[in-house]
Amino acid sequence: VLAGKTHMAADRETIQRLGIDPDSRAGVLMRQCGFEPHERDDGLHPAALADPDLAYNRYLREQGYESDNSWNEFANSAEGPNGEVLSGWCMRNAKFAARVQEEHSETAYMTNRAMDFIRDSGNKPWCLHLSYIKPHWPYMAPAPYHDLYAPEDVQAPNRSERERRDPHPVRSAFMQHEDSKNFARDAVRETVIPAYMGLVKQIDDHLGRLWKFLEAQGQWENTMIVFTSDHGDYLGDHWLGEKDLFHDESVRIPLLIHDPSPQADATRGTRDSRMVEGIDLVPTVIEWLGGTPPEHRLEGASLLPLLH
């Protein structure tokens, strides 16, 4: 079940062209990319592209944030000194707090929806893909997370003058991208990265809230938890923005696994530097649940031998 962000859009017509009934069980799952959506969060769009009926937009309006696109106007916009609305799409505004209260922000909201799903599942087995949109641009954090960190907390960028003077032609092209040019400037990094760090801290806090909820529901000791990300962000390292190439900043993402079974006690709390991939996660979960990963359909390898 999906709660949160996905880049995949349901496509009924494609399923029909494949000769599959889009309303069949297989067709529904395929056009939802294998998910049963509990709540889809397909990302924030500028006003011209906004769907006013998104569940999060409806929720914000119910809390008094009146707008055709409350997500954009409140969750990802700040208020200037003269009451003007400052867009989170402009990096210079990352130092301001979002107009939305923290308890109604994207991260808090999706954590609540995840807990709703777990609570509603009762004693039935469940599998949840909780996908947070933050930390991600628009770089706009709600108070108090917008100013928990200062420019002095920002680490020096991992880049060299040689990289800038003599880049590979492909990297040279990416260095000309607007984001790369922006993050090449120290002033931009010192404005954006503290907000980015605040958004990471907010994720930490709400995951802590979710862990306590699982404990209260009696499910901490029978739930495998996998924490990871789809990619990193250069934020100025190697004179780049975004996440397009193969440096560690882009592809070396976190992977933390909580395996509550006694077989994992020997490795609990340890770190492993061997390279694994996202495609290894589905075989890992299948084997942990007692199944046999179908090798003719799955490319990855189970990570249980590293955990047990």
Positions of PLM-derived features:
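Short glycine/proline-rich turn/loop motifs
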Residues: 87-101, 174-194, 260-267
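Short, solvent-exposed turn/loop segments enriched in Gly/Ser/Thr/Pro and often Arg
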Residues: 2-13, 131-136, 161-169, 227-232, ...
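Active-site His/acidic residue clusters
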Residues: 115-160, 176-191, 234
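A long, amphipathic alpha-helix that forms part
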Residues: 105-121, 182-223, 288
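Catalytic-site neighborhoods of secreted/periplasmic enzymes
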Residues: 1-100
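Histidine-centered active-site microenvironments of extracellular/periplasmic hydrolases
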Residues: 138-144, 148, 212-270, 274-277, ...
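C-terminal cap/loop subdomain of S1 sulfatases and analogous C-terminal strand-loop tails that border
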Residues: 14, 24, 28-35, 45, ...
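Polar, surface-exposed loop/tail segments
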Residues: 5-17, 93-111, 115, 221-226, ...
